[in-house]
Amino acid sequence: MVAPRSRVLDVGCGDGALLDYLVHFKQVDGRGMELSQAGVNACVGIGLSVIQGDADTDLADYPSGAFDYALLSQTLQATRDPKGVLDQLVRIARRAIVSFPNFGHWRMRWHLLTQGTMPVTPCLPDAWYQTPNIHLCTIRDFQQFCAAEGIAIEQAIAIDGQGRVAPIRSYRWANIFGEQGLFLLSRR
């Protein structure tokens, strides 16, 4: 989804694995923002340009259109203000790429139905009382949110547990079988 030699901001970049890949294999001009000092240190240690920052408050400091892409990988559900963060992403970049765990996946539903407890999965490895996830959504929730907020979905992909990818628009059961949603967004 990321074009070679583009300007990229990876928000919530963690240890920098994705940003490092994009810098070395797609020759992007990559920058990162990470909340944890340990993550910033890991990124800087491998030569990445990363600052410590909070997506909920610090994205407002970037000028409009500063990047070609703003990435938010597996971070949206941990933000305090997902709407505000998404508004900032599509403001500071021509396109935003957002991925998140799909809380509508059939295994999640089945676990809640049969066990009555919040599931712990490879995609969501923390117990409910230890998780950073505070805003849970499904693929369908996210699509409805984007429509209501004037955010265009240019491409949408559901990813299952084996890494298989299916386009969401042509895959009727994406909300049930996709463990993760991956969206390419822009401002309408």
PLM regions: where:
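Conserved beta-strand/loop positions that form the S-adenosyl-L-methionine
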Residues: 11
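S-adenosyl-L-methionine-dependent methyltransferase catalytic module, highlighting the catalytic core
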Residues: 83-88, 95-188
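Conserved alpha-helix/loop element of class I SAM-dependent methyltransferases that forms part
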Residues: 1-5
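Short conserved loop adjoining the S-adenosyl-L-methionine
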Residues: 58-64
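Conserved SAM/SAH-binding loop
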Residues: 15
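A short SAM/SAH-binding and catalytic strip from SAM-dependent methyltransferases
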Residues: 69-80
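Class I SAM-dependent methyltransferase SAM/SAH-binding core
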Residues: 21-58
